[in-house]
Structure formats: structure tokens, C-alpha cells
Amino acid sequence: FPNLDMHAAGLGRFRSRYWEKLHDVLDAVARREGAQFVRWLFIRFPAPQLSFAQCRKLRDRFREEGKDGLSFHYLEEFLRHRDLWAALWRHLRLCWASLRLEKHARPAFHFAGSRLNFWDYAKGDWAESFRGWRGLERCLQNRAFKSYAHCAGPQRWTLFPLENCPWERMLTQAAHEAGNGPVF
């Protein structure tokens, strides 16, 4: 939980310093409608603030209290056994494709009219994105988002912070493919 308000968490309330006053707006709507409707989906990033075990305990407490959302899940909870195999197969296909494309991409890594080639600067990112842990992680996340969208079903809307992260596109696509409603 990066940016978690630890004081509120100690009281069983989920409050992110990232979302700030949006929590109050969502709570007001829930009170007006008589029930919580927000489904919180967390993507785990290692952080010094809390261990994974502590994060799970907080998530469980937020679920028990039920004050700030209808559900609280980590993305990885939606990975099924078959998703692991499908993601691994997709990752292997990307590995093979990147190796085939690399011989064509390497000479193309320059601006038009320039002979300065940027391949030496980008080759590590290329390899990590297609053949490394990041590539496999993205394949797993893509499967998990599709599973989440299917499980969540139609929603009023899906909202996420626009930080230009690869997972944002995956969430958007999964929600649209599942017909879950608008994405903001």
C-alpha cells in the first residue's frame, strides 16, 4: 500500500494519500445509496513501509470492517492455474518474436537523418521488456486483469490513476472486452 494513511489504517479505514479527498466523496455517495459500491484492486509493489504479510492483514481488516469499499483484492488473487500456463506460453512467444525482430530493430534505432544509433542505450530495456522478468510480469498481469474484469462484472465505472503505466492499458482493455462499463 504505497501512500497508505497509517493512522486511518489503524482504525480499520482504507485511506490512500494518493486519492486524498476522493475517499470522502465515495463514502458520501455510498451513504446516500445505502451501501458501499467501490471495488478496490491493489497492485503490489515492494515498499519499505509494509511487508507483504502486513499488507494482507490490512487488506483483511478493510474487508472485515467494510467501511470503505465493497471489496479489497490484490491483482494476483485473480490468477488461476491456467492463467499461469497461458501467460508463460505468451511470454515464450514474445521471447522468440523479440529475438527474430531484434536483427531488424537494431539498425533502426536512430532518428531520421541521423547515423547515431541508440541501440546500445536501449538494448537492455528491449531484452527486459520482451524476454526478462518485466515481460513475464506483464503477461501475468494481463491474464489477471482479464480474470478480474470477468469476476467483477458490469460496474458503474472503472477509475484508475493515470500514471502512464503498462497495467493501465491492460485494465482498460480488459474492462472494455468484458463490457464492464466506462473506464476513466
PLM regions and their residue ranges:
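Catalytic-core helical/loop segments in enzymes performing group transfer/polymerization on anionic/lipid-linked
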Residues: 1-184
